[in-house]
Amino acid sequence: MNCNDYPMYGFADKAEVLDAARKYWNPDKTDFWVNEGIPLVIGKREGYVLEDIDGKSFIDMHLNGGTFNLGHRNPEIVDTLKDALERVDVGNHHFATSGRAALAKALIETVPGNTMGKVVFGSCGGEAVDVAIKSARFATGRKKIVSVIKACHGHTGLSIATGDDRFLKMFNCSRPDEFAHVPFNDIDAMERALSGNDVAAVIMETIPATYGFPMPAPGYLAQVKALCEKHGALYIADEVQTGLGRTVDFWCFEHHGITPDIVVTSKGLSDGIYPISATILNERAAKWLYEDGFAHMATFGGSELGCAVALKTIEITRRAETVEHVKALDVLYSKRFAELLEKHPSLTEVRHDGTIAGLKFQGEDEPAVRFCKLL
């Protein structure tokens, strides 16, 4: 791999790194992977390949949940950051900058139909979801948020309440009067949740990622959007893991025939080079920005370095050759997955759209775990 040696920061080997991680960082997460037989400490990384610090190479099919869509350490994006560092830093979030204005304009222009009006920047997806929820509550004067059971929209203050009970209970974040959860692809359950006309917004990943990438049933998302309009709620499309060209279209919701009121993006927006997130709002959702622009502040939100990197990421993603490459991968994966389904009876279902894929196996966890270890 053509990249610099990975810094060890004084540790002699992997065992020392893992011991320090247990002691000073996260004992449960460290031991989880070790006990599963995956004692991975990522060292060198480039393109779609990464190395354990012991030298074993892996094809990175996880990509940190869609963070490295254009590959680890994409040379064009690295050069963009280096160039920006010669002239700017994170800047001051209180004042307008050319980079922030340019990125906001570029993001608004990615959403079809000229429907979006403003962009609020942050540094991670959870923060962007928090902004989306606050915007919807201000716009509607309502408090209740509806999400999908087993969803994951982040782990910050408001976003965690939209997700798995496992984390809500741990941090005493359950708020059943404010946050409701319904099964994915169950339009009747969604209608019941909205029928009280007290919901500020429905938030959905276009394809729920940590839920195993179940595909939306034909027409389901359009029906949800129609219910939102009927009952006065906003529709928040969480495209943190499904957007930025991963399903051929720039945003996954485009080929489901919907126009969200709010779009959330992060992760791959900077291809893993500099943290940045964005909450894209239509004019209704952006009303609070006219009343009190200081109502949400983030020191590193829309940093000048992050904006430079994100602009380059969008430019590369929208190139014709990038789009054609994703189309070709979509066709290739469809063919190969069909062959795998025919060849391996333990594989019962493939959930696939563009470069996104989830594989369902017979039984509970064991076949899937065994498959992952073989990789």
Where are these regions (language model features)?
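Conserved N-terminal phosphate-binding loop of PLP-dependent enzymes in the Aspartate aminotransferase
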Residues: 1-375
